[in-house]
Amino acid sequence: MFARAAAIASVPVMREGTALDAIDSRIIHCKGALARLKELERVVRLLTDSMAGNSAERTIIPLMSYVLALCQGPLFGVSPTLRKRYELLSQMRLVKLTEVNAAASLGAVDLWSRWPADEDDASAVRSKFYDETLHGRILEHLLHTTRNCHALYQRRHKLLLAERDACRTAETQEWNDLYSLAVDDFLVPSEITLGLELAVLITDRDTDTTDMAYQKLNIQVLGMLLEYFNGVAMPTINQYYLELQRAVRNKGINQNNILTSLPFWAHTLHRIFAMLLRAKYLLDIIQSVLRLAYLPNKTHFSHPTVQLASPNLYLFRNVLEKLDEICCGTTVLSARVTEYISPFLQQGVTHRLTYDKVVHLYKEAVRPTVSSLTEAIDLMSNLLKSWEASCSAEHISRLQTLSEDDVSTLSAVEDKFLIDKSLYEEGQKRKQENKKSPAANSTSKKQAVTLQRRPSNRIVSTNASPLRQQVIANGEKRISTAPPMRRRSLSLQRVSPSPDPDANRRSNSLQFSSTNQILLQSSVREALSRYQSRHANIERPLSTPPGTFPYHAFASSMVDEESRRIASLSLAEGNGPAAIKVMANMASEYEDTSRESSLSGCCNYQTYANQVLAQPQLAGSFPTVPLVKKVRFTGVPPPTEDEDPKPKRKGWYKKPAVLHYPTPSQSMIQKNKQRHEGYVFRTSLREQQREKHKQPGRRFAAFLDHVKDTNTLSGHKAGKIKSKLTR
């Protein structure tokens, strides 16, 4: 008993997660079957009422073969007799109307699907397809079989609910509250409702029952079913599949947080089982529909004229080979998913909700099932495209000039096959390359565009000025611009101020720098304007070649003159010394640069000016900035040295006390954790007290004295309080 409890405790079970046992699985299957049978009974009644108003001029015939195909799956598996009757009805054969009174049991239901040998004679199938009397009797027998099966499932459902309540009394109420919300999106029998649209209106039997009309009717049915699968059935399955995929791939996150992010995470196993059961129903329905469409028209699809009309003959022949395996062979599309969900229905099987269990079900059951379902829908889509092309008006007009035994027709078919094969292989190869390196392809495209655009920035025009040519020859220094949302000041090297910079200034230090920066911007702007005006007034001699124009002396004189003007600027009263010092340093720097190289000095001067002028906030606020001293708040002086002391050493800080002691080793920490002790209590209180009192013989003397003193004090206080109350 203790070993079993320890084993259960070692399994990382999700908090408040619901385990999935055989009773839950059978309840899910039983509830889905009851909903389908109820909807089927309603559809059969409506189809019977629609046939009641038939006349010689207007006849409505339900397509019972396709209606019965929508009932394929483990729906009638509750009784072998009812299962056999359903198979006979699918062959358009009548059955007995005696009621089956099988004893209700809690055993597993047969989930395997079996298809009888359908007729492949097109004329015989077409004659039954338009038989009004036969379809009316099939509806009557199907209604009786449906009611009988519904009664058996109701008795089975009651027994399962009673068994569940007896086994899990504590979780019954929670299960009843969340059960319908957790799995109902996979149990809605919406495909049964399509039976109301599966009917044909006959107004003229000579034109409405021809071979071409029969093929067009099958094409319409396939198109409607394909639209339903892609638009209604698959989105629900794909959505939950993607949610499971994200949960499985997020390995670095906490496993509990991953599972709790799923919808109805406490019933994750129930939802997975319901989704797999829903996928099995869809796979069985698709296989039944493909058998009805392929077997009677197998000869038609192999006709050379039909193959010439296909968009891709190589793909069409591959589709025909797969259809031959599915419809004429022993291949069952739902065989794999049936093997996965059958163990869930076995008695005594319980699956606990763990992260590893969800990952295992996703990899072994969910992913292969969704892949098989997608491939089956694609197979139906490819068949529909080729079939529509063979029945188009353009192809019908071509049939008058083509013959089946004509040598030119057969050679054209082979030529089309070779061409379509090469095109198909090239397309598949291109898709594989795109899947392998999508990032590399996108990067190469971006790099190609960049390489095409880069040389345009370095193009040297013959009409450019000599100064520009010299700058390009020496190598222009590029200035990287910041994004427009975050403008940077190149002089202050910090983020641009807020829309109201005056309110955010803390002390007088930033006021000086901001004022100096504003004056520097204005002076540089004026200097550049004068420089540009002088440069525009100077006329270059016609006899001087472009490469020998004396710009060096002109640039040197301009830099010297403007530097002296900037150095002579002064601020308002009270701020003058700081501003004059900054401006003088700038002037001396520009003078030294101009004396070394006049041309490079001019370029550096323009570059620095552009950097300074790249601050629209300061430049725009220059006329409105008052030159007054700011404080933090009204009536509060600037911070003193006691409040904000300056560091005495550069890069020096006081070492925290915790850094003086070495950290304990990991093994010691783990050892103390296992003993449920902290690192501080590595010495017991007994040893401390014994060393303190130096009495090895008395172990608990000091400890008992301490307890005695504590009790005495507490008793003394209690006596005082009692005496006050008794006064």
From Swiss-Prot:
The record's principal subcellular location, in a coarse class, is cytoplasm
- Positions of the UniProt region annotated as Disordered: 427-514
Disulfide pattern: none
Ranges annotated as biased composition (Polar residues): 439-472
The entry's cellular-component GO terms read: cytoplasm
What terms describe the molecular function in GO for this protein?
protein phosphatase 1 binding; protein phosphatase regulator activity
Keywords annotated in UniProt: Cytoplasm
List the biased-composition ranges (Basic and acidic residues): 427-436
Q: Determine the domain of life of the protein's source.
A: Eukaryota
Q: Where in the cell is it found?
A: Cytoplasm
Q: What does this protein do?
A: GLC7 phosphatase-regulatory protein involved in GLC7 subcellular redistribution and chromosome segregation.
Q: Per the similarity annotation, which family is this?
A: Belongs to the GIP4 family.
Q: How does it assemble?
A: Interacts with GLC7.
What is the recorded name of this protein? GLC7-interacting protein 4
